[in-house]
Amino acid sequence: SFTCVVKINDTEHTLEREVSTQRSFYEPWVIDGLRIWFDAVQDIFDFLAEAHGECCPRKHARFAIQDATLRICPEPIHPWCPLPEGGLKIEHCYRGEDCWLGAYNGASAHGGLDINHPAGTPLWAPFDIDDHYYFNSVEMGHNNNRWRGMHRWENGAEWILQAHHMTELTVQEHKPLKQGEQFARGAGVWSGDAEHSHFVFKVHDYGETILLDPWILFWQMYQDQQHFSFES
């Protein structure tokens, strides 16, 4: 676990996060009208390596903060994959450790979120995707099939999604995707001890690219599943 003390409107608040436990899938704090996701701190990298995907913050701590009356994004988010009933379970994150920042092999902070499901599980575009492609593939000589997709919002921010261990793409690379369109079958290439897909979420804005816990997106997907019907 890791903690911080933040001062908001002259009042101190102590925030605590756990990773590699069920509490990895936490509710954000709502304080004085702000929704706060306490994403990461540098201190844990005194004893954890960063050898399984980028995830260390550039400063002492990393937060995602927004107006608590707003959604994570302006439109409903379609499930990225079939959502496990009842929410994500830490025991279904590869070997029970590979949530965001979880200790992969007990020693390396995990730069993504693993969700166990069978090889060939459909993956869908959570929102419209402007461009997408394999940035690594077995065919190109890499040890994995890794997909990347981008969406640019009206305010200029770009959201970057990645999914690894892809069995195959089901659409042509660089073809724009509509929300809910299947783009791949997941979990089938170099997935190790348990078939799973590895999800990554980045935000590019103001000239910087920031990695964030993919749980933030999945949290909104579960919220939206209660209020919207999606076709796949």
Task: Give residue ranges: language-model regions.
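Short histidine-centered loop motifs in beta-beta connectors
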Residues: 118-119, 124-125, 155-182, 206
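Conserved, short, structured surface segments that act as functional micro-motifs
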Residues: 114, 147-149, 175-232
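Surface-exposed, beta-sheet-biased, low-hydrophobicity segments with strongly acidic/polar composition
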Residues: 1-83
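Short, surface-exposed linear segments at secondary-structure transitions and domain or protein termini
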Residues: 21-35, 169-175, 220-230
